[in-house]
Amino acid sequence: MCKIVHLPVRVRVFLCVCCISLACPDQVPGQAQRMELGRRLQRFENAWERAEPAERSACVGPLKTAVSSFFSLRLSEAGRQLDVAWQRARGLDMASEFEQSVVGLQLIAQPVCADTEQQSLKIQLRPFYETVKQPPPDTRLSFRLLDASGACLAETSLPLSAVLSSVDWMTGKLSEGDHRLSVQLQSGADSFVIPDLTISRIAGFSERLAALQKNSEKAAASSALEKAAEAVTTVPPTVGATIRSTATFLKSLSEARSQETDFPALARLELCEDLVAEGAAVTEVLSRRGQSQDLWLTLANGRRTVATRIRCPELTQAPVPVLFVFHGAGGSENMFFEAYGAGRVIQEAEKRGWLVVAPAQGILGLSLGIQEMLVALESCFSIDRNRVMLLGHSMGAAQVMRQMQLHPEIPKAAVALGGGGQIRESDVKTFAATPWFIAAGKEDFGRRGAIQLHQSLLEAGGNSRYKDYEDVEHLVIVQAAIDDTFQFLETTISER
C-alpha cells in the first residue's frame, strides 16, 4: 500500500476542517466564496501565462500566502493574495488607484437559473475583502447580458452606490440559453472589468425539472428492480446516476443555492433530456453533445458513483486515448477545466484527440477506481485501453500512486506534480513498470514527496524523469509543467 510519509501540517489542518464541515456544513465558507476565489485564480493564471520570468518570480511570495490562507479556510485573504500575484504577473509595482479601490469587490447575481418568464435580475457588489482605498463617488457600472453568439440581450448602467445595496435590474424576458453577464466599472477615464457570470434561462423550467425528477425516480426504481431480479439493466447505470445528480443540481439552482463555479444549466438539462428521449443511443447522444460542451457525467458501478467532468475529442471512428486527471485537496471535478493554467491541460489533451476524465475525490479518496470508471466509460464512448494515462496534482498525485497500486496493468504513463511520497518496497517494482514524469516547484511544499517518489522508482530500476521548476510554488506547478507533461505523455503512448 502507498505510504505517504510527511503530510504537511497545512494539509492535515485542511483535512480536519473538511471533516468538521461534513458534520457542520453551515459553519464553513460558502460555495459563493469558492466560486469567487476560482474566478480570481483564473484571472491570475491567464496573466501568469503571458508573464516574463522576473514577473513570475515576483508572484511566488503572495502565492505561498494564498495557498496557506486557502488551507486555513481564510478564503478572502487567499483572494487578496491572488490579486497581489495578478498585479505582479502584469509587471505592475502598483495598480492604479481606481483598481485598488474596486479589485476587492465581488459580484452577486440571482437567479442564475430561472424560467424565460423571469423579468428581473437581482445584482449586488459587495466586498470579498476590504481595501484601503474607496471607489470614487462617480463610479458607475455597465451591465450587459450576452447570448452565446455575443449578441446583447439587455443592458443597463447603474451607480455603484445603488449596486452596493442590491438592486433589481428589470431585464425583461430573456431568450432561452446559457448567457453571459458582462460587467465593467468606470470612473472618468478609469475602468475595471469584473469576470463574467453565467446566467441561464430555460423555457418551462419548473415543468422540465419536475419531468427530470420523475425520470430520475423511475431510473432508480428500474435499476433496483432489475438488480434484485438479476436482469440486464435497460437504463445504463451511468445514465441513471447522471439524471439523478443533474436533477439534484438543477433543484439546488432553482432554490438559489450558491454553486462552486459557473455551470451551463440549460446544456446540462438538455443532455439529460436527450438521454431520456433517445434511450439506448447513449454513445450517439454523448458524442453529439460532447462536441459543443463539457459533459458532467456521474459514472456508476452498482450503488457506488463518482461525479466527473469530461471533455470529448473530435468525432472519430477509432477508439480514443483516455487521460484521467486528479485534482488536489479542496478541488473538484471542475479544477482542471477552469484552473491549473486556466484550463490549458484540457485544451492540450483535446488538441491531441484524447478523452479527458476528471473525477471528483473527497478526503477519503475516490469512490470508483480507474478500472471501474473505464467499464462505465465503455458504455458511453469508444476508448482505447492501450492508451490510458494518469495525471495528478498534490493529493491527486497521491491518487495516481493509489491507482497504480490497484491497477498497475492499466496506465501506460503516469504524471505526479507537486506531490508523491515514499512507497513500500513491495510496491516499487509494480510502479516501476510504467514510465513516470514527476515534477515540483523549487518553492513547492510538495517537492519532498515528489523527490521521494522519483528516487524510489529509480532505485527499483524504473523509468522515471524528474524536473524542478525555478520560482514556482505549489499552486502554479501544473501550469509551469504543462508543456513538459504533454511532451512526455505524447511520446510515451506513441512508443508503447
Feature-to-residue mapping (PLM):
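Contiguous beta-strand segments within globular domains
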Residues: 111-135
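The feature captures the conserved acid-bearing segment of alpha/beta-hydrolase catalytic domains
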Residues: 413-486
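Short substrate-entry loop that stabilizes the transition state in hydrolases
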Residues: 315-320, 325-364, 446
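Glycine-rich nucleophile elbow surrounding the catalytic serine of serine-hydrolase chemistry
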Residues: 392-402
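A domain-start/cap signature at the N-terminus of enzymes
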Residues: 108, 163-168, 172-320
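Long, contiguous interaction/targeting segments characteristic
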Residues: 31-99, 323, 391, 474
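Amphipathic, heptad-repeat alpha-helical segments
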Residues: 28-63, 100-111, 118, 202-246
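Gly/Ser-rich "nucleophile elbow"/oxyanion-hole loop immediately N-terminal to the catalytic nucleophile
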Residues: 317-318, 365-394, 408-410
